[in-house]
Each structure stands twice: as structure tokens, then as C-alpha cells.
Amino acid sequence: MTEYKLVVVGAGGVGKSALTIQLIQNHFVDEYDPTIEDSYRKQVVIDGETCLLDILDTAGQEEYSAMRDQYMRTGEGFLCVFAINNSKSFADINLYREQIKRVKDSDDVPMVLVGNKCDLPTRTVDTKQAHELAKSYGIPFIETSAKTRQGVEDAFYTLVREIRQYRMKKLNSSDDGTQGCMGLPCVVM
């Protein structure tokens, strides 16, 4: 069974835990209890493949920012979550993305931009803005509601698909026949 290490990042109060719990336990948590760090595991079938999702739900509060580098190192893919009724959380996405790229030492890291709380009528972040940001990053954008479950599976499953594509790309680029297992050219005698 293939395992995927997913990390949910974003500002405090955007619904990272609510999204994760909705996926794992199929229920909505409406009281706000700031997370320090929680880990969840769930077995799912995505595109006919049985997968084990190892999901790290992270702290959005600034006082826990020192922990970010550590979980960013171990994560394979990132759900970058903002709340559609919180413009500051949308602006913060770039900070998370830049930190992920720095820690991973790569511009090519599987990510999905997630606009949560789409069930709320008080939108301050336009869908078009979010689509444009995602397009500029070269990543998918999905609107979700942890309350109604809209887009929840889609967000996590899309991230798994992004990780699969990334793994295949890495496999193909290292499997071009020019390098042996020690990183040296092979010589047939």
C-alpha cells in the first residue's frame, strides 16, 4: 500500500483541523480549538489504488512557526488553506509557499490551494483571485466547506494525484539510463 505524507498549512482559524476531521471522521467540528500539531491516518482508494494518507494538521498561530521547518521537511505534499472570508489568510498563502520551497530546496513541490468556508455568504476573497494565484503557482485550486463537506475529498485526493505525478516525474528523470545506482555512469564491458 502506497503511503502519502500530506501536510495541511495555513493561518490560524481557516479551518485546517475542521477539513482534516471532516475527511477522517465525517463530521464537522464547529468550536475553535487552536491546534499545536495533530496527526491522522486514513486508508482510502483513489483512482483504484489503495492509499494510506498520513495527514499532519499544523498550527496556524505564529507562536508555533518554529515547528514549521520540521514538518515541511517530512511532508510530500501540502494543502495551502485560506478562508474565503479572511483576506489576510489569503495573503499569508505566499509566505507558507515560500517557506515550503525554501525548506524543501525546490520550486517543484506538490501543493493544492484550498479556499475553505465556501458555505459562508461573507466572501472577501474572490474565486477569480484564488484561481489566478493558483495558476501563477502552477497548482490546482479547490473551494471547500468543512461544514457541508463540499470539496473536502476532492482537495485531499487532488493533492495525492499531484504527489503521484511528482513521483513519476522524479522516477522518469532519474531513469534516463545515464546514471547507475551510485549516481555514476554505467559502463558495459
Swiss-Prot record:
The enzyme's E.C. designation: 3.6.5.2
Lipidation (S-palmitoyl cysteine): 181
PROSITE patterns for this protein: RAS
Cellular component annotations (GO), alphabetically ordered: cytosol; endoplasmic reticulum membrane; extracellular exosome; Golgi apparatus; Golgi membrane; membrane; plasma membrane; tertiary granule membrane
Span of the annotated motif Effector region: 32-40
Kinase is among the record's keywords: no
Impact after mutating residue 13 to R: In CMNS and colorectal cancer; somatic mutation
Signal peptide (residue range): none
Effect of residue 61 to R: In CMNS, NCMS, KNEN and NMTC2; also found in lung carcinoma cell and melanoma; impaired GTP hydrolysis activity, trapping NRAS in a constitutive GTP-bound active conformation; promotes melanomagenesis; promotes interaction with SHOC2 and PP1C
UniProt binding sites for GTP: 10-18, 29-30, 57-61, 116-119
Consequence recorded when altering residue 89 to A: Abolished phosphorylation by STK19
UniProt keyword Phosphoprotein present: yes
Cross-link Glycyl lysine isopeptide (Lys-Gly) (interchain with G-Cter in ubiquitin) residue location(s): 170
Lipid group attachment sites (S-farnesyl cysteine): 186
Gene3D superfamilies given in the database record: P-loop containing nucleotide triphosphate hydrolases (3.40.50.300)
Subcellular location: Cell membrane; Golgi apparatus membrane
Effect of residue 164 to A: Loss of GTP-binding activity
Effect of residue 60 to E: In NS6; hypermorphic mutation
Family to which this protein belongs: Belongs to the small GTPase superfamily. Ras family.
Clinical note on disease: Leukemia, juvenile myelomonocytic: An aggressive pediatric myelodysplastic syndrome/myeloproliferative disorder characterized by malignant transformation in the hematopoietic stem cell compartment with proliferation of differentiated progeny. Patients have splenomegaly, enlarged lymph nodes, rashes, and hemorrhages. Noonan syndrome 6: A form of Noonan syndrome, a disease characterized by short stature, facial dysmorphic features such as hypertelorism, a downward eyeslant and low-set posteriorly rotated ears, and a high incidence of congenital heart defects and hypertrophic cardiomyopathy. Other features can include a short neck with webbing or redundancy of skin, deafness, motor delay, variable intellectual deficits, multiple skeletal defects, cryptorchidism, and bleeding diathesis.
Protein's name according to its UniProt entry: GTPase NRas
Biological source species: Homo sapiens (Human)
Source organism phylogeny: Eukaryota, Metazoa, Chordata, Craniata, Vertebrata
